[in-house]
Amino acid sequence: MDENIKKAEYYYKKGVEVGNKGDVEKALEYFNKAIELNPFYRDAWFNKALALRILGRYEEARECFFRGLAVEKHLTHKKYNSDDEK
């Protein structure tokens, strides 16, 4: 597994952990770091959107939600095409 992907997973999990404890600002920092390391981390995009919504930053939350959907579509398309090649 790529080192950046491992690091992104670490930061994502930390974001979930601190977010569950109520520190939404810190969770947002962790989700941003995870996305910086792996821009295709769908769950990080969705959780970033949730954190932004909680913070009342609705337009940014909407944008992140749609980024997450775009990543999901990309990954599904990529998987579908790789399955066809088998």
UniProtKB/Swiss-Prot annotation:
Gene3D superfamilies: Tetratricopeptide repeat domain. The keyword Repeat applies. InterPro entries: TPR-like_helical_dom_sf, TPR_rpt, Ycf3/AcsC/BcsC/TPR_MFPF. SMART domains: TPR. Pfam families: TPR_16. Keywords: Repeat, TPR repeat. TPR repeats lie at residues 8-41, 42-75. This is Uncharacterized protein MJ0572.
